[in-house]
């Protein structure tokens, strides 16, 4: 793979394949400010322009309509910034530069100017061999994922005011049957639904962050990569000392679990001289540490990335002789796993709550108020019944969880095929498809949009797709439309992540309304090139008649596309943390 600022050109495309563009640039002709003789392309006739012979700049100059441009070959090892410095010092008269490099050069060479663009919107990408089609598909998916999820890596410590200002609540959790999982494209889990309800009360977007292990949950919290941890975490003396713990929302017993075929073990005294397996970061370790010497058992440590549900599976398979688990998790596990049994509680009843940093007093107060109002209420009871009391649901959901080998949708193969052709991440298209139709190929909207991707019949005809209710054709139409809209926003000034968000908004409300919103954002002093907090805010104003009448494309019920982009972004972020690219 060639990773660098590699422009996609006709000559290069004959020899190698390219990834989807990572950005777009303008190619600028550059001279000194004192040189006023060069103002337009025609002025290059008979002039000497210094560029690398093998560069895309040389290719563009040779393809120019102006005859007589003389290319002076610079050393292939010479970087564009070095060439710009030579022009600034008067050692060369004219060169060509990407717009982003030119902007950087002005900081140390203010005597440079660009009189005109040689090429506009030149795509920059990674290069690879044409035979590496699988690698290209993986790179394309990665580039979409990186663009849309790069904010997940950002670390900042925020209390309530900052969370509301950013309009995002980052919740740290784990991918388990009792916390958060994906089932047939839908985001589910007891902790997830509680967190979503809390985010709704704050009026912010929920962002789920899944650290690589249980141990890393609190490490992420301390480093500012999340605002709170919601993963069925018990109140322990050590956690009370180091963190701010919320009011409890569950009370559980810590149960000793053995294989069902072990009929001799009736309680802890029967494990004298034997081992109990737990994670060191778990509350179980603290509980057992207080009594192991007295009762004569040993503690064996499990890997930190092993979840309690996986531990119970190993107990059932006879690989682990004894382990510990919270009573609610055991209750859920027993709906589909009859190979384990509980031999009773160890210690007192334990409180379960969310964990925050001690520098978040306002957030803790808000969470406590939420928990006290939530506990034993209608929504809470519904969630407990949904996740811990329904054996039929438990069995079906666990067998089809995306992280357990199930599919995101019934159409993963078709989505992968078409997304690959159009350089999109199949998980993004699946998130969009769920938003459009909940995976119903016969869905028809009130305005007549049809199929899995809810494409209008007239648009389907333009895209040369005949039967939108056929899953293969319906997905193809939606992917084609997303690719078309993505290409409308390939300005160098628009970040890759926002090109995708603009394309999603265009899919929902049309590119005309998005263009109107971008212009309105500029008039409001906002960025016309960023979606969240900028163009989305302007788009909402197009729902006001007095503002919409001044817009080229008029009135728009634009709360829908704003929610559409936000919900797909959220769903996609969750998909990529659980389901691999391939």
What is each PLM-predicted segment?
Residues 391-439, 472-475, 489-493, 578-582:
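Export/targeting segments at the very N-terminus of extracytoplasmic proteins
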Residues 33-57, 99-103, 118-162, 193-201, ...:
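Extended ligand-binding regions for polar small-molecule ligands
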Residues 48, 53, 275, 280, ...:
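Substrate-binding/active-site groove segments that recognize
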Residues 498-574:
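Catalytic and substrate-binding regions of cell-wall glycan-acting enzymes that process beta-1,4-linked
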Residues 1-15, 57, 72-85, 98, ...:
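Extracytoplasmic small-molecule ligand-binding "clamshell" domains
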Residues 6-9, 25-80, 100, 170-179, ...:
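Bilobed "Venus flytrap"/periplasmic-binding protein-like clamshell domains
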Residues 17-24, 28, 72-73, 110-120, ...:
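Short beta-strand->loop
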Residues 3-15, 60-64, 85-120, 215, ...:
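A ligand-binding cleft/hinge motif common to bilobed small-molecule-binding domains
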